[in-house]
């Protein structure tokens, strides 16, 4: 039986809103740490100079980094209105699965 120390870190997919209202999608094992990096300009180059930033959505991914990367790729392919529906809670990932096929 695995102890807590032996369990793999959960992965998360998240969306950050930039000052220009654009949505940035990324993955991490620690959302608050990664968002703090983005705010300090030490995160993704795509977000540098785009502040103030707001963390608007995150979702834990149970199946590890590979699954998180695949979901990130799929979310990046969504339209702005579909991403906004996720943020507003008007759509869930499983509802958007049809789009991914």
From Swiss-Prot:
**Pfam families from the UniProt entry:** GIY-YIG (PF01541)
The family this protein is said to belong to: Belongs to the UPF0213 family.
Q: Under what name is this protein listed?
A: UPF0213 protein VC0395_0675/VC395_A0575
- InterPro entries, A to Z: GIY-YIG_endonuc (IPR000305), GIY-YIG_endonuc_sf (IPR035901), UPF0213_domain (IPR050190)
**What is the superkingdom listed in this entry's lineage?**
Bacteria
Q: Which cysteines are joined by disulfide bonds?
A: none
Location of the GIY-YIG domain: 9-85
């Amino acid at each position: 039986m695995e102890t807590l120390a032996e369990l793999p870190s959960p992965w998360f997919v998240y969306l950050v809103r930039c000052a220009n209202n654009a949505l940035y999608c990324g993955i991490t094992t620690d959302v608050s740490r990664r968002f703090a990096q983005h705010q300090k300009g030490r995160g993704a180059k795509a977000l540098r100079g785009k502040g103030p930033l707001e963390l608007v959505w995150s979702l834990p991914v149970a199946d590890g980094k590979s699954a998180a990367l695949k979901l990130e790729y799929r979310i990046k392919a969504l339209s702005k209105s579909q991403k906004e529906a996720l943020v507003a809670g008007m759509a869930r990932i499983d509802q958007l699965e049809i789009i991914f096929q």
